[in-house]
Amino acid sequence: MKEFRKILEDKAFFFTTLYILISFLVFKIFPDVFAVIVLMVFFTLLLDPVIRFLEKLKFGKYFSRVAALLLFFFVMVYSLYMIIPPVFNEFGSFIEFMTKVFESKIWKDYIKSPELMPVFDKIMNFLEPKLTDFLNYVFSLVTTNFVSVTTIIVFTLFGLGYTVFYIREIASFFVLIYPKSVRAEAREFFRDVYASMGRYIRVIFINAVIIGLSYWIVFEAFNLKYSAIISLWAFVTNFIPIVGVVLEYIPVLLFSLTLGVKGVLLIALFAILIHAVAFVVFIQLMKGLEKLNPVYIILSILFFGKLFGLFGSFVGVPLALFFKVFWRKFLRPLFEAG
C-alpha cells in the first residue's frame, strides 16, 4: 500500500498517466483527430533530419524549414502522380485475378500429398474472404469516405506546416503542462520518446521504401503484371513489423503460383534476400536505442489495432516504444526503490 501511494505521489508519473488516458479517450471518440495527429507526427519526424542537416549548412531556421516542406510536397506529389494512376488501373483486374486463383484452387498443382491438401484448402478458404474484404475495405475507404479522407489530408498538410515551424514551441507547451517541480523530468522523458520514435519511424520508412522499390524493379524487369499494386502493398505492409511481412507475402505468393514452380522459388528467394537486407539495415540503424521483444511487438499491434482500428496497427510499435520509455523513466525506478 505504501509503494502504491508513493507511485501516486510521483507528479511526473501521475500527470503523464493522466494525459495518456485523456489522449486515448479523445482519439477513441474522434478517430479523424487521431489519424491527423499520427500523420503529422510521422511526417514531422521524417523531415526532422532534413531540417537539421540544412541548419548545419548555415541556411537558417526559416529557410531550412521552407526548403524541407517544399521537398516534402514535391516528393509527395510526384510519388502520387507515379503511383496512383497505375494502381487504380490494376486494382480491378487484380481483384479478378485473386478471385480466379481461389476459384481454380491453383495450389493443387503444387500439393501432391492427399493429407496436406485439406489443410491447404482450409487455409486458403480462411484467407480468401479476409483478403477480399480487406481490399474492398481499402477501396471503399477512399471512395465512400472521400470527404473524411480529404479532411484528414488537408488538416494533416496544414498541421504539418505549422508543426515544422513551431516544433520547439509545441515541445515547450507539453513541458509547461507539468508542475514546475517535475518539468525537467518531463522534458527528458519527451526528449527520449522523440529520439526513439523518430529513429524508428525513419528506419522503418527506409526499409519500406527499399522493399517496395525492389518489388517494383523486379516485377518491371521481368515484365510481370501488377507491379504497381504489389510494390505499393509491400511498401505499406512493411510499416507493420513482423505481422506486415506475412501480410505482404500473401498476394505475392498467390501471384507466384501462376508462374510455375520456378517462378514460386525465384520470388520466394527474392523476398528472403530483400528482407534479409532490410533486416540488416534495421539492426544497424537502430543500434543504441530501445529494443522491443517480438512478443511485445505483436501484442502491441493487436491491442492498438483493436483500440484504434487500422491506424492503430501501424502505430502499435511507436506506441510500444513510448510505453517502454515510460516504464524506464517512471515505473521501474519506483518499483526498484520499493
Swiss-Prot record:
First-listed, main subcellular location of the protein, grouped into a coarse class: membrane
One protein family per Pfam: AI-2E_transport
Keyword Lyase belongs to the record: no
Localization, UniProt: Cell membrane
Membrane topology: Multi-pass membrane protein
GO CC field: plasma membrane
Membrane-crossing residue ranges in chain numbering: 20-40, 68-88, 147-167, 203-223, 239-259, 263-283, 297-317
Single biological process term from Gene Ontology: transmembrane transport
Keywords, ordered alphabetically: Cell membrane, Membrane, Transmembrane, Transmembrane helix, Transport
Entry-linked PANTHER family: PERMEASE PERM-RELATED, TRANSMEMBRANE PROTEIN
Similarity comment text for this entry: Belongs to the autoinducer-2 exporter (AI-2E) (TC 2.A.86) family.
Name of the featured protein: Putative transport protein TM_1349
